[in-house]
C-alpha cells in the first residue's frame, strides 16, 4: 500500500490530489491507506509518519497544505520512503508541487492584459501554504507593475466564504 497523509481531505485541491494518487496507485497494483490528521491531533510531520510506520505501507506521500512546526527539520525514517507535496522544498526529503506563486502571477498578468485596471484577490486560510504563495504572487505582480494593491478578501476554501467575498467585491467601486 501507499500511505497518504492529509491534514484536510475536504478541500477541492486535496480531494483532486488524493484522487490522482489513488488512480496512480491502482494502475500500479497498489492500494492507498489514508490518514487524515484533523484539528485534534499533534500537527507535525513526525507524528504523521510515526503513525504511518504502524500501518502496512511501502511508502508515504504527505500532502502538506498547512504549516507544521517540524517541516524544516523533518527527516524521514530510513525504513520508510517519504515524498512531500508542498509549496516549499523540504530540507531532507524529496518534495514536489505546483508553482502556486507563478500561477498566481500569470493569472494577474493575463487579466491585466485583457484591460482590467486591477485584480482583486480572495485568499485561502492563513494556515494554507498554497494560499500564502498565491497571495504573494498576486501582490508582487501588482507591486512590480506599480499598481495599487487592493484589499485582500479572506476566505477558507468553503463556498460560503467565496460567496461573501463576491458580495463584498460587488459593492466595491
Question: Residue locations for each model-derived region?
Answer:
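Short helix-capping segments at alpha-helix termini
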Residues: 27-28, 142-148, 172-173
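Alpha-helical recognition/docking segments in bacterial nutrient-uptake
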Residues: 1-109, 113, 171
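Hinge/beta->alpha junction and helix N-cap segments in small-molecule ligand-binding domains
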Residues: 6-16, 34-43, 96-106, 122-143, ...
Amino acid at each position: 500500500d501507499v500511505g497518504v497523509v492529509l491534514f484536510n481531505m475536504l478541500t477541492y485541491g486535496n480531494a483532486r490530489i488524493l484522487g490522482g494518487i489513488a488512480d496512480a496507485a491502482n494502475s500500479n497494483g497498489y492500494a492507498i491507506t489514508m490518514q487524515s490528521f484533523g484539528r485534534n491531533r499533534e500537527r507535525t510531520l513526525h507524528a504523521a509518519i510515526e503513525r504511518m510506520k504502524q500501518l502496512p505501507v511501502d511508502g508515504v506521500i504527505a500532502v502538506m497544505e498547512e504549516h507544521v512546526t517540524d517541516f524544516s527539520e523533518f527527516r524521514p525514517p530510513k525504513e520508510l520512503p517519504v515524498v512531500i507535496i508542498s509549496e516549499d522544498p523540504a530540507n531532507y526529503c524529496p518534495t514536489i508541487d505546483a508553482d502556486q506563486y507563478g500561477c498566481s502571477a500569470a493569472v494577474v498578468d493575463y487579466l491585466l492584459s485583457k484591460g482590467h485596471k486591477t485584480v482583486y484577490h480572495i485568499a485561502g486560510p492563513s494556515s494554507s501554504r498554497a494560499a500564502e504563495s498565491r497571495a504573494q504572487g498576486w501582490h508582487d505582480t501588482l507591486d512590480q507593475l506599480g499598481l495599487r494593491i487592493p484589499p485582500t478578501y479572506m476566505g477558507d476554501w468553503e463556498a460560503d466564504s467565496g460567496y461573501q467575498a463576491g458580495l463584498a467585491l460587488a459593492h466595491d467601486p
